[in-house]
């Protein structure tokens, strides 16, 4: 009971990051836009699982559509406040075509799904193209890049703390958040694998893969690659870094995460980024 109540810090954090980001965007303070992206989205599934396990299913729909509301409101305000539309490049046109193409299938009588199911699927598919246009229309000068980097590094450290707890107890964090029950009820996915979660949480031989507070180990590994890219930038500009201790902790956190997420692709990416880093700083002897 106590653990369940303590875990509510995740949905509360999600809600606070959403509210703070919406308020900032409404006021035109786009420098705070990243708060929801960094502090909210990574714990989205975990927050929903915890709400479900605490019997708070009534508020889950509000959380489920919050990210779409954030995207639509942010994009709408950006377009409304634009002095003039930008010149569209080939990637912009590709994204627009993609959204229109997928929207057509909502109206066409194809497949066994009803209109509601198609609209929900379209909502999920369109999320990242709309997110792309937010980044496309944002003026980079309005963003606080250094704060964004710091937020991502702090996220990596917190992820490693949860991961360290998983390693000490040899227990997936998702087993106490209600992950399996949530997926079974809302997505009709029966628990699979040796640990009652899904096969994604283990590799051959039943060796555990850990996800920290992310939705699954693959998402955990992918987020670590973003952290690594920022670490490379920070290490190259180490003399200008105002948070050397945070940089060090983030390095340790990324190593821990990339090892125990057990993702071959992410490990290869980690080694590739490390190789490029040593090439950039002209320390080729370390590589051999």
Give the predicted meaning of each segment.
Residues 153, 287-288:
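Signature aromatic-anchored transmembrane alpha helix within multi-pass, membrane-resident enzymes
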Residues 53, 83, 110-114, 140, ...:
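Transmembrane helix-loop junctions in multipass membrane proteins, especially transporters and channels
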Residues 7-17, 43, 60-79, 122-130, ...:
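Membrane-embedded alpha-helical segments of multi-pass membrane proteins
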Residues 10-24, 71-85, 105-168:
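Transmembrane alpha-helical segments and their membrane-water interfaces
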Residues 26-39, 87-101, 135-167, 171, ...:
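Interfacial loop-to-transmembrane-helix boundary motif in multi-pass membrane proteins
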Residues 30-52, 58, 62-129:
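N-terminal hydrophobic segments of proteins, predominantly signal-anchor/transmembrane helices
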Residues 22-32, 79-94, 233-249, 283-287:
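Membrane-interface helix-loop-helix junctions at transmembrane boundaries of multi-pass membrane enzymes
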Residues 103-106, 130, 149-173, 187-262, ...:
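Alpha-helical transmembrane segments of multi-pass inner-membrane proteins
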């Amino acid at each position: 009971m106590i653990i369940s109540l303590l875990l509510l810090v995740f949905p509360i954090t999600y809600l606070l990051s959403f509210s703070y980001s919406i308020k900032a965007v409404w006021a035109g303070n786009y420098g705070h836009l990243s708060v929801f992206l960094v502090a909210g989205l990574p714990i989205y599934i975990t927050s929903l699982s915890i709400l479900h396990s605490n019997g708070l299913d009534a508020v889950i729909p509000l959380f489920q559509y919050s990210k779409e509301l954030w995207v639509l409101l942010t994009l709408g305000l950006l377009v409304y406040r634009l002095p003039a539309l930008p010149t569209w490049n080939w990637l912009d046109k590709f994204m627009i075509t993609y959204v229109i193409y997928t929207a057509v299938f909502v109206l066409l009588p194809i497949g066994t799904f009803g209109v509601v199911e198609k609209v929900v699927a379209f909502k999920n598919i369109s999320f990242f193209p709309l997110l792309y246009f937010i980044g496309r229309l944002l003026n980079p000068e309005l963003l606080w890049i250094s704060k964004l980097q710091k937020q991502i590094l702090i996220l990596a450290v917190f992820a490693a703390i949860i991961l360290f707890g998983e390693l000490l107890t040899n227990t997936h964090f998702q087993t106490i958040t209600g992950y399996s029950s949530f997926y079974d009820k809302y997505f009709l996915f029966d628990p699979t694998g040796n640990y009652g979660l899904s096969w994604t949480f283990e590799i051959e031989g039943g060796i555990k893969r850990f996800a920290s507070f992310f939705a699954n180990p693959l998402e955990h590994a992918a987020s670590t690659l973003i952290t690594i890219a920022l670490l490379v930038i920070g290490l190259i500009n180490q003399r200008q870094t105002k948070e050397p201790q945070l940089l060090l902790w983030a390095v340790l956190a990324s190593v821990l995460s990339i090892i125990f997420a057990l993702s071959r692709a992410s490990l290869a990416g980690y080694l590739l980024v490390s190789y490029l880093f040593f090439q950039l700083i002209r320390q080729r002897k370390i590589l051999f």
